[in-house]
């Protein structure tokens, strides 16, 4: 009889915990003036079948990297390591442009396929076949694609579902916000162990994100570290204690929803991103001038009128992105 009670207790408490998390999620969304149960959409493969793409009902574009350790389309039971090749960069580029030109998209969400990896970076087997000149243009293409992502005036969130190393971290660093899944996963730029450097934006972005001294230590040692350490240095913004991959997807979608219409002023978010991205590279007085121009643009927008009027009337604004 006691054994039966233990079994019932073992099956009961996990359900209670899940219900409690759902209630807390609804409370969080209610505080934001929204209750949206948007779910993970059906994703469809891009041309080379190395990226899956889809858009949620509330305007979150999902770009999912999916390949094996050779950088080939995932077949059978091969582990999704999500390494990239030139063909994957073409798919990533096409997905970014699809999201950029879609007026219904407010947020771009990057993630990796499977339970283990966000991305392990470039396929070493693929790179080993290339000439030095080809590798140079390979890095240039990656630079251009990630710069396009950074210059898209929509918030970009990287959902780090697993190991994020090498070029995988370089992709993640081009996002505006990085959210990791709790687990025994590693982060790092170990390229020095191959006799090269992190050449698709690693040295440039890491030094800007964590500072020169910390970036140097990470890259010259090539060491890998945990998401917790990454969070301590502000390389990762948050770590979600999601029990399953599906729950992690839902948790990140719920967070992403706060940046979607009509709950967030998408035009203002885009201008904030433009000011931060472009302004850091110019003298302060020019940055202030850019800021004024972007603010002037917003003052003339319908969203600014909506937001200011709602504040005066003590109402919740509903933005249209105009």
PLM region spans:
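C-terminal long alpha-helix characteristic of the crotonase
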Residues: 180-185, 236-289, 302, 318-322
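Conserved CoA-thioester-binding segment of acyl-CoA-metabolizing enzymes
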Residues: 9-12, 16-111, 147
